[in-house]
Amino acid sequence: MNLIILNLYYLVILFSIIGYGYFLSNILKLYINVKEIVIFGILGIIFLTFISYLTNIFSPHGFVHNIIIHSIGIILFLSAVKSEVIIKKKIYVIAILSIIIVCFSLLSKTHDDFGWYHLPYTLNLSQNKFQYGLGHFNHGFRTPSSLFYLNSLFYLPGIKFYSFNFAQLYIFQFSLIYFYKKIFNKENNNSFEIFYSLLAFIFISVVFYRLAEHGTDRSGQTLLFIVIVLILNILSKNLVETKKINLIILLLVYLITIKTYFIIFILLMLPILMFIKKDYLIYKKIFFSKTIAFSILFLFLHFHIQLANSGCLLYP
């Protein structure tokens, strides 16, 4: 695969992801700061996965389908840039970092499970619409990850299945930028949050830098670090921010779709629940928000896929 073509596709899809993140933040009224382009990126990953779950019921994720999806994403991205929601200077920085990450990713092999079931499952999504009973063909098909569905949207002419690790790279990239900003943010006076972000940045850089380490678990663990930072931020400010709580809920839901065992980390919400205590107005704002409605629908689609593949709602 030509390196220039690979980088061009990576950048185009990256901008599409950010565009969808901007769109989702508006729908859910999350009011993301213009400086938080990384959050737009993470939200874009979540929304594109949701779209992938939904559209695969009716259609395979072939070239035409994916070109339409990313054309809309680019339009959304350009509208965000035009309205100055996204700062142009940050785009250049992310673009340069993207090229570096793509080049370095080629130095290592793919994950050991990639050829076993990651590639076949994702390729099947690109060639066929939703099917029941896939778990009978391959043991790995019984544990579908949302990352396979996200990667299936990157099946495009000229690159084909060479993009089937892009999802992991985007999560890796957004996480590094997120923690880097937390470490060097002059407005952040929380030393514990800065120290934790530094440890997370070093850990991800050292342990997860090779593509061979990125199956599905590593991406979930990376996002889990972000969830913990958001929780620390809420608790340290001694201020309930429903926007951040909604963001935490979205991330926890997405973690469950990556690997079902991440469901145990819902317990991380306990400190926030203890912090809110009996403030029923805040509970009402959270439980009757668009975020909860979106999350319920997202989980319904995920467990429907899980049931269709393995016959179990929770597997293994």
Q: Model regions: which residues?
A:
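Membrane-embedded, hydrophobic transmembrane alpha-helices
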Residues: M1-I87
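Transmembrane-helix signature of polytopic, membrane-embedded enzymes
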Residues: Y31-F40, F179-S205
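Membrane-interface alpha helices of multi-pass inner-membrane proteins
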Residues: Y53-N56, F208, K244-T260, I264-P271, ...
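Perimembrane helix-loop-helix junctions
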Residues: F77, V81-I86, F265-I296
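Active-site lumenal/periplasmic loops and adjacent helix-entry segments of GT-C-fold
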Residues: V102-E193, L211-E213
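Membrane-lumen/periplasm interface segments of specific transmembrane helices
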Residues: L107-K109, L150, S289-P316
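Multi-pass, polyprenyl lipid-linked donor-dependent membrane glycosyltransferases
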Residues: A167, I171, I194, L198-A200, ...
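Membrane-interface transmembrane helices that cradle and orient dolichyl/undecaprenyl
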Residues: K186-N188, L224-K244
